[in-house]
C-alpha cells in the first residue's frame, strides 16, 4: 500500500516517466503482477497505441488500459458481479419519465413542467449527479427538515426527493445504475486478489467526483501501489492557474491521512515536450504575475478572419502546407474547438480539401431517416394523423424506398394534401384520393395525359401502401396491454415494414461502395432500436401501460441514442473540444474560435440545483456537489492552458470577427495575454495577408479554382487583383489535370441574370397559335414580361394551401352578391333588414361549403371568419340598397361571362383582335354587374366591378393609358358590342365605369360620447361610395343620383355640382363620351401591342415601377427571377407619370364605330 504522486506543469515528462516505468516492468517480466493504467474514456485508445506502437515491446499480458467502469467489470469477473440488471442511460431516463408522469399530481414546484420531455432529462441528470456525489434520498429529506430553508428550495427538494425515492424503490433488488455499480465495485475491492498485487497508475484526470474519490481510496488501500499523475505545481492557492488539479491533490492528501500513509511526491520541473523556446516560454509565463517578454521565433501564430467559415478554410490550407511542405502526418495534427458551431464547419469544409479527420463527439441518432421515420410514426398516432408528422414520415423515404422517384411522388402527394386540407382520418378516405381529383390541383382543372395519369396512380398507390403500414402498426399497438406486448407489436410491425431486410441491404450496398462509416451507422441504428425495446421490456416487463404513455416513453428512449464514431484510419487529424479532447504531443495544434465569450466561456448553472443551493448544502450539511459556476469560471484559464500545451512543435490560435448568426465577436482576452508575452507576435489579419500573399490561397486544386473565380470576378469589377491570379488562371486553363470544371466556373463570371428572347416559333410552341386569355394576363405582362413568361409560359404555380387567401374572399363576395342579386332581380332598394339577413344566410349556406373544399367549416377560426363575411355582406347590401334608392340605373346582369364563342345565350361575344404577327387574340372574362338606364330610345350602361381590396378599387386613367389597367375599358367595350344580347335599344352609350369596394368600414371617433348611431350609419354608407369614371352627359349625371342639385356632392357616385349647376372639378370624376370611346379604342391597341410582344418572345426581367412602387412586392416569382432592388434598378421600366391622361387621349383617332353589334 504505497502512494506516489507525479506533480508538474504541462510537458514536464510526468506521463513519459509513467509510460517508461510501465514498459520497463513489461520488458523485465511480461507475465508479472498486473499493471493497470486508469485514464478517461477518451484517452484509453491513445494510450493503448503508445504500447502497441513500441517496437521494443513484444507483447505483454500484465498491462491493461482501463477507465473506472471497465476496471469495475474486471474486478467483477474475478469476485463475482451484482445480480441486478444494469440500467442503460436510456432505460434510466425512460423509467424516470414514467415515474414523473405517475407522480405529477404530487409535485409542488414542478407540476406544470412535468409534462415536458426535457424535464425528465434534467431530473435524470440531477439524480445521477446526486449519486456521483453520494447524496441519497435520505440526505435530501434531512435537508428539507431545515426550517430556515426557503420555501421554493424546500418544494424543489421535496419534488426531487419524491422522484428519487420512487426511483430507488423501483430499482431495488432488481436493477442497478452505473453509479450504483461503482459503489458495488468499492465494496468488492477487499475480495480481489488480483487487485492486491496490482500496480495502479492514474493519468489524464483534472478532477473527480465523490464516488471516484472513494474508488481511489479503495485502490490506495488494497492495491500494491498507486501512482497518480497531476498537472499542477502543487500550489493550493484557490486563485492559482492549477486550482482544479491542486484541489484533487488536496483530496488525495486527505485520503492519505485517513489511511495513515504518506505520499511520495516527485516534482517534474524540466520541460521536455516542447521543441522550441516559443512554446516553452508560453507554458512557463502564461500565469506569470511579472511578464518576461521575449522575441517570438514563429512557432506561435494568431489568425484573425472575417467569418468562421473563412477561419476553417484557412486552417485547412495550413494543414495541407503542414503535410506537403513540413512532412507531417495527419495524425501529428490536432484541432481543438469549443463553440459547437464549428463542428458543422469541419464536416462541410475539411472533406473539400481531402483531409481525413475524426471528431471526438457523439452525434444524436434522432436525425437519421430511420429514426425520423419511427418518431414521426409515433407522432402520427399521438396526433391523430395530423398532416405535419405524416409528411415527415413520407419524406424520410424509408417506407417508400421501393418506388422509383419516390421523392417526386411524395412531393406531388404533399401538394395535393396541403391543397385539400387532408388531416386526421381523411387520410383513410380513398374517395378523396381519386386520381381524377389530381387533375384539379392548383385550382386549374385540366384533362390528364396518360403520363400524368400513370404518375398520379403511382402517387395513390404509394399513399395506400404507407397508410396500410400505419394502420397495421396502429392495430398491432392498440391490441397490446403491457409494455412487453407493445414492444413485441412494435418489432413485429418493423418486420411487417420489412425494415430489417431493407436496412441490411442498404448497409451491404454502402459497404460495397466504400461508405463504411455510413454502413456502420445503419448497424448502430438497428442495434440501438433493439436495445431500446430490450430496455423497455427489461424495465417495465408485463406492467400495464396505455399506448399513449408507451409511445411517449419509447420516444424518450430514442432521443438518448447516439452514434459512436469509429476512426476509419489511423492517419487522420484529431478534432475535439478543448474541455474533453485528450491529445498530447502533437506537432501542430490549432485552437479555433478563440473569441471572448467562448474562451473564457461564461458559465451558467444548468442543473435543477442552483449554485446558491449547492453552497447552502456545503455550508449546512458538509455535502459537496458538482462545482458551482463561479468555480468553473475560475478554471477557464486552466482549460486554455491545457489546450495550448498539447503541442510540441507549433500552436496556431484563430478567431473570427463574426459569429454563426452574424453577430460581432471580440478576440479572447487570453490571446491578448499570450500576445503580451512576446515582442514580435502579431495578429495576422487573413484578408490583408491573402491580399499580399495570394499564393497562400493556392494550396488545393479544387478550392484554388473557387478562389480564382472570386478573384477574377473582382478583376472584372475593376478592382485591383494580384497578377498571380491571372498567372494561375493561365496555368490551370492549360493543364488537362487541373482545368476540369474551369469552364463552368468561368461562365458564371459573365452571368448577368438576363433572360433570352424566345422568338416567334418557340413562343407559338409555348403559348399556342392563338391567345386565349383574360384581361389580368395582359395586365400581368405589363407589370413584368418575365412574370407573364413564368406563369403562362413555364406555367409555374405556387403551391396551393388549405387556407383562405385574399382572392378567395373576393370570389366569395362575388358569388354571394350574384346569388342575392339574382334572387331580387337586382332591385336592392326593396330590401329591408330582415330580408338582408335572410338572403345573406341563404347565400352563405349555399356558397361557403364549396369554397376550398369546405375550408370555412374546418375550424373554429374559419367559422368565426364565416360570420365576419356575413356581417360584411349585410353591410354591403345596406349600402347597395341606399345607392339603389337614389339611382335610376337598375342592375340587370350579374357575373356575365364573355368569350369569342359563347357557350350559352347569357354569355356575351368578345371581338377577336389580331397581333402584328397575325395571331388571333381571344379575350375572355366576367363582368360583375351591368346596370342600365333607358331614356328616349337610348340605353346607358354602367359597369360595376366588385373589389374586396381597397388598393384595386380605384380607376387610374394614367394606368389605363399605359395599358396597366385594362379591365374596365374592356368590359365597357364588350357591353357596347352586345346590345342585342343584353336586350338594349339600338343606341347604347357608356354611363359609368365604377368600382364598388366590398369591405368592413371603420369609423374613428375621439370619444364614446361622440358616437351618434344615425350619423354612424350615414358615415358607414358613405364608405361604399363608387369610384371610377362617369360619362359627363347630363342625362347620365341626373340618372346616377336623383338628388343632385347645385352645391351638392353625391355620396354614392363620384359626381358633384357647383353653385351654378356645373360639374365640380374636386368632387367629380367625369369625361365626355368621345373621350371614353378613345380610351376604349386605345385599350384595344394596348391589347394588340401587348399580345404582339408576347408572341415576339419577350421575357425580360423588367418590372414596371409606378408611383415608387414595384409589382415585385407581391410577385410569386422573385425566387425565380432573382431581381434585386439594390443592384437591378436599371432593369426597372418607368412611364411618364406627369401626363394628363385626358389630354393625352385626345390624340387618339377612332377607327371603329362604337355601339354596333359584333
UniProtKB/Swiss-Prot annotation:
Note, other: Despite having conserved helicase domains, this subunit does not have helicase activity.
Binding site for [4Fe-4S] cluster: 784, 1112, 1115, 1121
Cofactor note: Binds 1 [4Fe-4S] cluster.
Cofactor: Mg(2+); [4Fe-4S] cluster
Pfam families for the chain: ADDB_N, PDDEXK_1, UvrD_C
Subunit structure: Heterodimer of AddA and AddB.
UniProt name for this protein: ATP-dependent helicase/deoxyribonuclease subunit B
Gene Ontology biological-process entries: double-strand break repair via homologous recombination
Natural source organism: Staphylococcus aureus (strain bovine RF122 / ET3-1)
Residue ranges of domain UvrD-like helicase ATP-binding in the record: 1-275
Domain UvrD-like helicase C-terminal: 269-583
Function comment: The heterodimer acts as both an ATP-dependent DNA helicase and an ATP-dependent, dual-direction single-stranded exonuclease. Recognizes the chi site generating a DNA molecule suitable for the initiation of homologous recombination. The AddB subunit has 5' -> 3' nuclease activity but not helicase activity.
EC number of the protein: 3.1.-.-
Family label: Belongs to the helicase family. AddB/RexB type 1 subfamily.
Alphabetical UniProt keywords: 4Fe-4S, ATP-binding, DNA damage, DNA repair, DNA-binding, Exonuclease, Helicase, Hydrolase, Iron, Iron-sulfur, Metal-binding, Nuclease, Nucleotide-binding
Binding site for ATP: 8-15
Any one Gene Ontology molecular-function term assigned to this protein's record: metal ion binding
PROSITE patterns attached to this UniProt entry: UVRD_HELICASE_ATP_BIND, UVRD_HELICASE_CTER
